[in-house]
């Protein structure tokens, strides 16, 4: 049992180190040597747990999906389906991007190394479902296309990733948290920015 726990901790250290390396340098430029150095483990320990850099990236994605799924369940229990839940969900995604390197890394992997089971697919179906529910319950104005709103949500979360990565690197400390910025953007979108004549 002790050996299994130690093995699990070692594996988790490697996944975290891979997430840091991928977040900072991207998948292509990430090296197993730097991952081992950051984790303070040998290449032998890495190859015991993972056959390749791709396997490590898959483990990062899996951890990010698990964190995201847990957060989505929390949001779903606290809000009625529809736009309110959508706003809170995207805010929580932004918060995860800002605070969890494994999530930021998985988001970067979407661009660097697309594949099945990416981070986007862990939350995009919920966004689509919430927008269909918002349309059914007439929260959306007639003529508002849920697919366009889905694209907007994806763009907002993708933008949140950019700001989260910048803030992780020491961006302006006077800027509000990324989740707060995203919620303010939703307010502008939902209220409209144009004054009526």
Kindly give the residue locations of the regions a language model identified.
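Basic, helix-initiating cap at the start of DNA-binding domains
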Residues: 1-25, 32-38, 54-58
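Short hydrophobic/aromatic patch on the recognition helix
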Residues: 39-50
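DNA major-groove recognition helix of helix-turn-helix
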Residues: 50, 60-61
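Hydrophobic alpha-helical connector segments
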Residues: 59, 70-99, 103, 115, ...
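Short, basic, alpha-helical segments at the C-terminal edge of helix-turn-helix-like DNA-binding modules
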Residues: 62-68
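All-alpha amphipathic helical-bundle segments outside canonical DNA-binding/catalytic cores
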Residues: 84, 118-119, 136-154, 176-180
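Short secondary-structure transition hinges
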Residues: 91-135, 139-140, 148
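C-terminal peripheral helix-coil segments that are non-catalytic and often amphipathic
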Residues: 121-137, 156, 162-197
């Amino acid at each position: 049992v002790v050996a299994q726990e130690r093995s699990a901790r070692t594996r988790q250290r490697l996944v975290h180190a891979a997430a840091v390396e991928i977040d900072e340098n991207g998948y292509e430029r990430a090296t197993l040597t730097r991952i081992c150095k950051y984790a303070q483990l040998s290449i032998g320990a890495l190859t015991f747990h993972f056959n390749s850099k791709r396997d490590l990236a898959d483990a990062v994605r899996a951890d990010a999906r698990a964190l995201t799924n847990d957060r989505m369940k929390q949001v779903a229990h606290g809000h009625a389906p529809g736009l309110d839940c959508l706003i809170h969900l995207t805010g929580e995604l932004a918060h995860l991007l800002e605070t969890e390197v494994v999530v930021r890394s998985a988001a970067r992997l979407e661009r660097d190394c697309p594949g099945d089971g990416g981070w986007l697919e862990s939350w995009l179906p919920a966004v689509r479902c919430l927008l269909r529910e918002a349309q059914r319950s007439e929260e959306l104005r007639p003529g508002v296309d849920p697919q366009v709103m889905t694209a907007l949500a994806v763009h907002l979360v993708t933008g949140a990733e950019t700001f989260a990565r910048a803030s992780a690197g020491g961006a302006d400390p006077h800027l509000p948290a990324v989740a707060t910025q995203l919620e303010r953007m939703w307010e502008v979108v939902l209220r409209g920015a144009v004054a009526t004549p």
